[in-house]
Amino acid sequence: MNTELKNAVKATDSKAQYDTSAKRLLGQKSILAHILVKTVDEFKGMNPKDVVDCIEGTPHISTVPVEPGLTNAASEKNGERLVGFNTENEEINEGLVRFDIVFYVRMRDGLSQIIINVEAQKDEPKGYEILNRAIFYVSRLISSQKERDFENSSYDDIKRVYSIWVCMNMEESSMSHVHLTKEDLIGSYQWKGNLDLLNIIMLGLAKNLPEHDETYELHRLLGALLSQELTIDEKLNIIGNEYDIPIEENFRKDVSVMCNLSQGIVDDTKAEIILNMFKKGYTLEQIADVTEKSISEIEKIVKKEPAMA
């Protein structure tokens, strides 16, 4: 296997592991509670610790397929047909696109529920416009409720849905709420129904971590959590001390894994740049200037090339 292919395989594996750890961290109830407090009207102003108990069960992380016909699964218990999220047969359904995180939240009235989906994006995709994908996801979360959350024509039982997209490495910090509105063209008839069923939150995280103030509170938390620049101690200090989030062992482990993997990804990328520049005839001094590596470090990377090929 040649060097470029080896590096590509290694990078893909590292990025996959990084993505898995990132989703597990985002899927922690304490983190999800902070997201809900800043994005869902009913929870705004609440203490995130009080919202944790509203999150029902364990959030499904990378298990529920997005594809029509596969989001739900039926089972039978005591002669009764039950329909829920499809979280089984991951091997059979390997390769399917899945929701990053999806879960139910019990509202403050203790009766109604909403469905929350959280998606993490390292940057804006090049092959399609991200808002179009978000619209598809939120539409699937609405349509898949049939037979799971309501039956036949009981459309009044449709649960409200939020699809929250956390987009990293943006030029600026931002947050937008995309939702349905009614525009009267002729007359002003009040059509019955709920315009608030479908909600998309686009949350942009700037490359630079914002200061801790009320406006950017959520951006700072998620920015620190997902940063590829901060050390483990810096991340845990912000998350634990500034946001009073309990740092349990599995949480600390995932933060550690993410930090190690992100450093590995950066190192692999730099090594690939160095090798490509060397092949194109750049001098060691020129490569050192561009990559901010010492000449001795560059020589070590270049010397490894024949052995890896």
Where are the regions that the model predicts?
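Polybasic (Lys/Arg-rich)
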Residues: 201-209
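Accessory alpha/beta interaction modules
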Residues: 1-199, 211
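Generic structural signal for hydrophobic core residues of well-folded globular domains
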Residues: 39-40, 105, 167, 206, ...
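Short, charged alpha-helical interaction segments and adjacent helix-coil junctions
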Residues: 5-12, 16, 116-121, 211-309
